[in-house]
């Protein structure tokens, strides 16, 4: 049955705080994207290359969702939002390195296909190792590991790790997915 039209329902408390946090994080994310776009356009003198870098951030959110799914973590607006924003900086850095190397190869006279192949060859190890060590470093948080150095005890699932597990899962999943995209998709799109 429908409630009486004179009845007014207003959600407060945690729901209101989540909405405010989501609004703030969305504003921060869009502002960061705008500033990144301005810096990238001036750095590369190319709107296409700047959009290519920024598209990696959007694509990496798929990896964030996959990371949460694999680790069976709930979607928490605050920690996942912070994870996406933090991930944006890492993904942008990897793509800037690739595009800068590609542009230097083009200035040396290589055609676009050879420049993309050489870029992939030169930057595979640094990009992969950076991502691998970051994901490996996040694994204790992803696994909700709690280490007590005094009693030499390792436990899993401590309440203090609840928030960090979502954040670490978001960054680890997104970075893994984004690294694969960076190493495969970015050079392909640069050739176009």
Enumerate the language-model features and the residues they cover.
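Surface-exposed acidic, glycine/proline-enriched linker/cap segments
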Residues: 152-160
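Extracytoplasmic/periplasmic membrane-proximal domains and adjacent transmembrane bundles
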Residues: 1-32, 41-45, 72, 113-115
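Structured binding elements
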Residues: 163, 167-168
